[in-house]
Amino acid sequence: VTTYDLVLARGRVIDPETGLDAVRDVGVNGGVIQAVSDQPLDGVTTVDATGLVVSPGFIDLHSHSMDVAGHRLQALDGVTTVLELEAGAYPVAAAYRRAEIEGRPLNYGFATSWAVARMAVLLGLDTSGDLRNDFLANIGREEWQRAASRNVVDRIVGMLERDLGDGALGIGILVGYAPRVDPAEYLSVAALAARAGLPTYTHARELVEMDPTTPVDGAEEIVRAAASTGAHMHYCHVNSTSIRHVDRVLGLVEKVRAEGSRVTTEAYPYGAGMTGVGAAFLAPELLHRRGLTPHSIGLLGAEGRIPDADTLRRVRESEPGSAAFVHLLDEDDPSQFDYIQRALTFTDAAVATDAVPLLWRSGAPDPFSWPLGPDAVTHPRTAGTYGRTLRRLVRQNGVLSLPEAVRRCTLIPADVVGSGVPTMRRKGRVQAGCDADLTVFDPETVSDRATYTETVRHSSGFVHVLVGGRFVVRDECLLPTALPGRAVRA
């Protein structure tokens, strides 16, 4: 009789690739799933999973919360792999090195960053591979957002190409933060991704409905790039960049897919976005395009919302990198939540958080202490995206079956990255030979608990979370000494 290091016994195993949804034992040795059996297995450690779902660990394609504290909050929401793909990092070697030296609870990976490479060239920025120091600190400076000569574009593309050689998982393109750049530059970056066989991850520029003067409609730009370059284009947080125009945007994606292009999408189940308050599209004179006012915006960690345009201008000048809530849709209004739900239930859409770096109101960041103190704040999506998806879309609204919701949190994101990253093909699955990244949750009680006022309340109902066969969460308790996360590289 084979004895396994660990057996998860008698749980409801959901494997989205094979369609398995049945009571099984799962045997784990050395960080790898060795057996999925309808017969009882013998384990050195056996954990009774009766009445619980045993799922692949959730894979977040879009997290900016890449420190230890952010990982821990996401672990309690069922996540086992967090990837910084939309903003990316430049140089990626520095981002990977920092995570390796400090240790991480969850698996992690980075795309290279078009925006930060652009800042390096146009601002002369000495980049560190850290989102706060590089991108957020310089988000409001106009020099990096301007159109560039062909020579400069070639330099930027060359820098990104070298970063792909250092293991970057693709190219993050924050074109929505530099919305006047030449569309030809975007196509050059997409063409590089196509040559490398890796995806791009785009924060779209303005839709024509929101800015009739945009050089190109943000959704059209993404689908045309897929068609003309052959690149796999991933459309980030299609809910928050499309808002009430989501049907037109998803219609374009459907059409280009039918013609053979690869365009993938993601969404999160919240009505408020969050970004640096200095972002171009939050200029007071542009807010009306999204149906917003200064009062739609609130600074993370501050009481109340911004009262007027003059205050917004002052804040944008003095602290452009400060994180701001942007209340786009009222998620408690069913007719408005329906826009978000359409993005989440679109064919093969991934659930992804857009998790935000934690901020400590006292000033000094404290990413290693646990539990988080009352002065730690973030967007509730950082702590609650997956719990909320399972609560609202599966249990309450019934618009996704449980196996389909699991697929959107696991296999779909694994496959988005997996085309150019073979190690991702061992994730998002509960099969012999796959990584033992596993999430065990109670389908009847799993829920988000974070709110816009209590932003770091972790989800409930995620009973056990394993990364590489090691518990990061056990019996709903985070294990602060567990740092089994490994780098995911192309």
Language-model features and meaning:
Residues 11, 26, 31, 51, ...:
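Divalent metal-coordination and catalytic microenvironments
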Residues 341-350, 354-356, 361-373, 438-484:
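C-terminal cap of metal-dependent C-N hydrolases
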Residues 49, 53-54, 69-172, 261:
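Divalent-metal coordination cores built from histidine and acidic residues
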Residues 1-56, 448:
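Histidine-rich, glycine-flanked metal-binding segment
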Residues 64-66, 87, 113-117, 176-178, ...:
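Active-site beta-loop-alpha junctions enriched in small/polar residues
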Residues 121-180, 223-227, 232, 236-402:
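Active-site neighborhoods of metal-dependent hydrolases
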Residues 14-25, 330-332, 396-407, 414-456:
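Acidic, glycine-enriched loop/beta-strand segments at the rims
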Residues 57-64:
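Metallo-beta-lactamase
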